[in-house]
Each structure stands twice: as structure tokens, then as C-alpha cells.
């Protein structure tokens, strides 16, 4: 079994913009599927550890082919090449039923015939026809992270189109990027559902920080999230954001908790990033 963390639109946007707001996460247990009859070889975890480049798997293109034209071969590739991603999409994001239901594929196709969703698919595929910049940025980022946190696994990344519900989906082996949540702060449809503050983080430039933040959060979770205080959560998220700033080589995230972590690390230069993220004594950040 593996854990998959779904990060809701409001959780992602609020986390990135205001540290004092809560992140809402729903954790779902998902069963492994047999992948022995794959049509192609997917990149394995840790591939970048050997020097290879990260390349976002274009699951979204198969989605687009099936959901806009009913192309059965695209559906077959979704099921065979990406069984876990397809199950997660159907059962846990769209909540359409069980993936082995004989009618599930027809149900999914009909669900996406909504004119708004068809527009999202078309616009996402147009904006993200090329993702070379994101591939390069992810490769550079994880090479830096591996130097600082050698035991960190390098996940497989894939793109998908959901329904504006989720931005990033994280498991122990993969990170899913919902392209429909990154169409730009001025994307017309967003104004109907999101505040200006939320829309400011729904851009292409936020994909890399989001991926890094939430993957690190999954690998270094806060202990006793439900029972710990809000200040403890804020400091924990501040640590994650501070590390992401270092990876990005710029202060993408700001705020009092990131600043507190920065002051602490300046005074404790021998402390490793792993030690920083694994230590849950938040009193040490108080000055």
C-alpha cells in the first residue's frame, strides 16, 4: 500500500500565499496495480540520481485524446501505461466509482463532456504544449536537493487535467501536476471561483515551488498534525519553504516563519537540511 496526499485548490493557494492559514489534506490509501504488461518503460524513481534528466510524463495528452475524441487507444494507454494515475483520477479525484466497474470509462467520458471542462482541456493543452522549461527546472532543483539530502527519493512527475479541485497530488513515488490549476492569474474562468489572492498563485511559475514544497512536506511530515498547535504547523511549513527558497536560489517564500528559520540557520551553519526538517523542536526558532 502507499499513501497519496491530495492538496486541494484552497489548501495549495492559501499555503503559498499566507503561512498562517491551514492546509487541508486528505490522505487516501491506494492499492498497487500490476504493471507487468506496460507498452513502454516509464522512468523509475531515482532516475535523476544517475544523472538523467527529469521529464514530466504527459498523461494529460492521453486524457485529452480520449476525453475530446473518444479515442479508445488513448484510453488503453491510460489504463496500461498509467494504472495508478488512472485509478487515482477516477476513484479519488473525480470520485466516479471503482476503476474496474464495466461502465466507468463511459462515465468518465460523459463527465468530461461538460463545456467548462472541455474548455479547460483545450486551454491546458495549448498552454502546456511544451514543458521543457519545467523539466529543466525540476532536474536542476532535484540535483541540488540530492546534494543536501542524499537519501531523498526522486519521484516520477506526471501532468494531468482534473476538475479545478486539486493542484498537486503527492505519493511516495510520484507527483501529479494538475495543469488546469496553472493557467495564469488572468485566466477568465478563475475569476468566477477564486479570489485575486488565490489566482496570483495559479501560474506556470508556481508549478516548481508547489512541487518542491508539497513533495518535501510528504517526505518530512509534521508529527501529530491534528494535535499540534498552529504555531508548530507554521514553523514546520516555514522550514519547508526556507529549503525551497534555497533550492530556487531566491526568496520565493517570505514571512515571519521563513525569516525565523533563516536566522536560526545562520546561527547553526553546521546543521544539515535533513536535521532541520527532521527536528520537531520548534522552540529553537524563538529569539
Predicted regions, residues:
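N-terminal mature-domain "stem" immediately C-terminal to a signal peptide or N-terminal signal-anchor/transmembrane
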Residues: 38-106
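Hydrophobic alpha-helical signal peptides and transmembrane signal-/tail-anchor segments
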Residues: 3-10
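C-terminal motif of bacterial Sec signal peptides marking the signal peptidase cleavage site
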Residues: 33-36
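Acidic/His-rich structured neighborhood in mature extracellular/periplasmic domains
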Residues: 107-278, 284-287
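Intrinsic-disorder-associated, low-complexity terminal segments enriched in Asp/Asn/His/Tyr and depleted
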Residues: 13-15
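Sec-dependent signal peptide recognition
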Residues: 2, 21-27
Amino acid at each position: 500500500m502507499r499513501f497519496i496526499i491530495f492538496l486541494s485548490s484552497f489548501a495549495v493557494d492559501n499555503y503559498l500565499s499566507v503561512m498562517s492559514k491551514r492546509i487541508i489534506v486528505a490522505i487516501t490509501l491506494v492499492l498497487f496495480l500490476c504493471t507487468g504488461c506496460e507498452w513502454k518503460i516509464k522512468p523509475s524513481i531515482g532516475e535523476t540520481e544517475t544523472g538523467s534528466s527529469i521529464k514530466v510524463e504527459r498523461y494529460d495528452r492521453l486524457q485529452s485524446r480520449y476525453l475530446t475524441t473518444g479515442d479508445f487507444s488513448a484510453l488503453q494507454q491510460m489504463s496500461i501505461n498509467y494504472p495508478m494515475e488512472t485509478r487515482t483520477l477516477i476513484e479519488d479525484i473525480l470520485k466516479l466509482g471503482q476503476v474496474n466497474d464495466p461502465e466507468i470509462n463511459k462515465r468518465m467520458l460523459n463527465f468530461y463532456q461538460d463545456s467548462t471542462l472541455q474548455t479547460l482541456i483545450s486551454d491546458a493543452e495549448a498552454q502546456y504544449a511544451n514543458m521543457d522549461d519545467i523539466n529543466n527546472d525540476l532536474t536542476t532543483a532535484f540535483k541540488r536537493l540530492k546534494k543536501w539530502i542524499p537519501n531523498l527519493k526522486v519521484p516520477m512527475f506526471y501532468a494531468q487535467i482534473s476538475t479545478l479541485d486539486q493542484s498537486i497530488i503527492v505519493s511516495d513515488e510520484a507527483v501529479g501536476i494538475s495543469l488546469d490549476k496553472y493557467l495564469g492569474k488572468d485566466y477568465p474562468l478563475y475569476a468566477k471561483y477564486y479570489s485575486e489572492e488565490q489566482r496570483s498563485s495559479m501560474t506556470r511559475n508556481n508549478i516548481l515551488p508547489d512541487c518542491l514544497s508539497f513533495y518535501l512536506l510528504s517526505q518530512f511530515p509534521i508529527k501529530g498534525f491534528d494535535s499540534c498547535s498552529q504555531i508548530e504547523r507554521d514553523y514546520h511549513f516555514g522550514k519547508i519553504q526556507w529549503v525551497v527558497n534555497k533550492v530556487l536560489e531566491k526568496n520565493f517564500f517570505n514571512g515571519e516563519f521563513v525569516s525565523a528559520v533563516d536566522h536560526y540557520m545562520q546561527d547553526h551553519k553546521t546543521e544539515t537540511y535533513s536535521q532541520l526538517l527532521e527536528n520537531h523542536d520548534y522552540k529553537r526558532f524563538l529569539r
